[in-house]
């Protein structure tokens, strides 16, 4: 099922609209709340806790005070506002105007409205930003949506300053079994957002990025542990968490013995320096 920019925007506007009506308390976002959500089985981030824990460590590995950062494909703005609470000047970018509205409200709820601005547009035209405007660009599960847009990668590279840092938290697309299951799920779901995810970040895309960065580090994770998708919304079960612990241990051991199998993992953290 093909998808247009308008269809994708409409889908996400609808998906994010529920956040327009939550309380300010529900929008509290800082380092402590993020750590709590990552370790709370009922939390939205728990399924990807390994990936997002690595993201959090990377984002906080250097002082953010005074840094100019872009939350690229920000969704409802958790990461951009988090960086603002650490002292960054944050810009939220998303195709969905509703997402930007929620993100700016989140910024106000956390007392950092003066450090956060929003821009609603598709990634093929970032003319709202100047060349080399950002010290850091972070994209959480966003690049596989935007690469289908003409000029999206060139625009991302343009707005990141020389020496700037790109951090990507992404689905990893080298495993034919996982890719087949993903595509089956997309066809069954009949949802335009899933149909729009037709470029999954894999070795080809990473090689393309390497041509533009002086350094690019890739940390794959979750091979057997991608079975977590089967247990979605059931992580409060002790038996499920025990099973996931066993799968995580299997992954650690196998990837120690055969690091080359990392390319078949289901998720990846990419850190690059321009």
How does the language model describe each region?
Residues 185-186, 220-274:
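A C-terminal cap/extension of S-adenosyl-L-methionine-dependent methyltransferases
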Residues 1-64, 167-190:
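Conserved class I S-adenosyl-L-methionine
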Residues 136-148:
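A short SAM/SAH-binding and catalytic strip from SAM-dependent methyltransferases
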Residues 197-218:
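Short alpha-helix
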Residues 124-136:
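A short acidic, Gly/Pro-enriched loop at the edge of an enzyme's catalytic core
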Residues 150-162:
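A short glycine-rich, Lys/Arg-flanked "PGG" loop and its adjoining helix->strand segment in the class I
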């Amino acid at each position: 099922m093909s998808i247009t920019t308008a269809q994708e925007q409409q889908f996400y506007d609808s998906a994010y609209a529920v956040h327009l009506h939550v309380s300010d308390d529900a929008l509290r976002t800082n380092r402590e709340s993020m750590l709590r959500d990552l370790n709370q089985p009922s939390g939205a981030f728990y399924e990807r806790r390994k990936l997002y824990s690595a993201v959090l460590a990377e984002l906080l590995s250097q002082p953010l005070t005074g840094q100019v950062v872009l939350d690229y494909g920000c969704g409802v703005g958790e990461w951009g506002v988090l960086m603002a609470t650490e002292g960054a000047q944050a810009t939220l970018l998303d195709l969905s105007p509703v997402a930007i509205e929620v993100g700016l409200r989140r910024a106000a709820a956390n007392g950092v409205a003066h450090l956060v601005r929003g821009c609603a547009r598709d990634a093929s035209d970032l003319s709202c930003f100047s060349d080399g405007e950002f010290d850091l660009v972070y994209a959480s599960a966003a690049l596989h949506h935007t690469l289908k847009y003409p000029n999206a990668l060139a625009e991302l590279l343009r707005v990141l300053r020389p020496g700037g840092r790109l951090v990507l938290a992404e689905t990893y697309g080298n495993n034919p079994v996982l890719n087949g299951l993903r595509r089956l799920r997309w066809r069954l779901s009949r949802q335009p957002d899933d149909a729009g995810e037709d470029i999954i970040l894999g070795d080809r895309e990473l090689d393309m990025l390497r041509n533009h960065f002086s350094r690019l580090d890739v940390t794959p994770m979750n091979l057997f542990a991608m079975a977590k998708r089967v247990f979605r919304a059931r992580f409060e079960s002790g038996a499920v968490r025990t099973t996931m612990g066993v799968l995580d241990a299997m992954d650690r051991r196998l990837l120690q013995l055969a690091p080359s199998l990392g390319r078949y993992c289901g998720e990846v953290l990419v850190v690059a320096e321009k």
